[in-house]
Amino acid sequence: MMKIKRFVYSLPEEEFYELVYSQNLSVEVLERKEIEVIFASYKEIEGLTPEKVEEVKEDWENWKEKFKPIEVEDFVIIPSWKKPVIVKPGLAFGTGLHPTTQLCIKALKKYLKEGMTVLDVGTGSGILAIVSALLGAKRVVGIDIDEKAVNECRENAELNKVKVECFRAEPKDVNESFDLVVANLEIHIFERVLKDILPKFKKIGIFSGLYKEKDLKRFEELLGGLKVKEVFEKENWYAVVVEKG
């Protein structure tokens, strides 16, 4: 635990948003009145006199959790420790909103180690490939059978200033193996291509797109004895982590 100072301010709503936008501030909104916003900052804001200064004891991680992205008009103000992924809206190849995408990101955050090589099967808009690169993967390859998806993957990788090799291909066309493979597909697709995906990873496989326990059970049958390391669940969707060795 650590002691930190919290500066509490009050401003008319319009001035509050102008301040937050112009100075790129991370603040905690404490209360909204009719035309006034009462907010706190964990550092003193130049040019403003705080209504009060509090000394609080708080865990650093919990303190950081209080700072959330703030939307102001067409802008999103993001705390420096967050990793934004910029996505150009496309033709339903993935926006990050679906539970399966979120489960894959959660698994990547836990199991992807810096310096790993990664293959993203069914890359779509490239979100999982981009996240892998941002997490420190040494090399990231994204494949998809749809040329439009491949183009979106390339565009989004450029927007995020990360290197992702995007190709139109099926798993059987890949002639190398990777430390980690991530595949967010559907059970009927896994029934057809999982046999081609499994040889492509050396250490960790992350698989999602599985709905309810019937899909989960069927997927485990397709693994052919490989060890399930962990299962993630959200809103009846599952992601499975498979480990080799």
UniProtKB/Swiss-Prot annotation:
Reaction(s) catalysed by this chain's protein: L-lysyl-[protein] + 3 S-adenosyl-L-methionine = N(6),N(6),N(6)-trimethyl-L-lysyl-[protein] + 3 S-adenosyl-L-homocysteine + 3 H(+)
Underlying gene? prmA
Write down the Pfam families for this protein, in alphabetical order.
PrmA (PF06325)
Annotated compartments: Cytoplasm
Instruction: Please name the taxonomic classification of the source.
Output: Bacteria, Pseudomonadati, Aquificota, Aquificia, Aquificales
Q: Which PANTHER family does the annotation name?
A: ELECTRON TRANSFER FLAVOPROTEIN BETA SUBUNIT LYSINE METHYLTRANSFERASE
Organism of derivation: Aquifex aeolicus (strain VF5)
- GO-annotated molecular function: protein methyltransferase activity; protein-lysine N-methyltransferase activity
Is Transmembrane included in the keywords of this UniProt record?
Answer: no
What is the protein named? Ribosomal protein L11 methyltransferase
Question: What EC number(s) does this enzyme carry?
Answer: 2.1.1.-
